[in-house]
């Protein structure tokens, strides 16, 4: 009888035998520029979930063609856009996630449209095609206030709060805890202005705290070095320290609607 039962199991499709069937998620991180996944400290989280078998995508809104740096010697425009596209591919490959989804919009242009229609249409198309279960993006702070970052945040949020995505889709915003950021600035750990000018978030709002492994962090730092056009050696080292500053914990702020309907502001 037992042998007959085992024989029947072998005839079932493989998916029926997989105890993880249906448990794998589509996770999508959406940022403005190639390298944003590193400075937001999200890349080790992406590496973790890819390692665990989830489908992980990185969506990049702009070509990053204006992000010139003297050490790289690459002029603004198509030359730099091509370099940064290759850097994004290198980073995704190093993290073990899917190839990057490049929306190809102009660097510095996202907030110039009166209705933000170009990025709205492109992201709406991406969401309908890939149907992510989990979305991670910039918080309202935009890190250090970059308008491209903030426009990505508002557009993703606009599309999410419409309620037209899957009912189980979740949205999270990357954030740097104020306590950790304060230690960074008071101890003068950083020389790159963006980290000293960062807009931190109180930990009481960062209620999602994901532990990552040492291997995930190492992958994230290796992936950072793919973005060679953006960081000279000393800035690579500083950004690596920034990525390690949260002690293997990645902090996220969830998008949360009120748990119940209320008809009074003061009660």
In which residue ranges do the predicted regions lie?
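Active-site rim/loop-helix segments in enzyme catalytic domains that contact anionic ligands
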Residues: 14-130, 157-165
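Metal-dependent de-N-acetylase/amidase catalytic core
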Residues: 5, 15-27, 117-267
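Sec-dependent N-terminal signal peptides
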Residues: 3-11
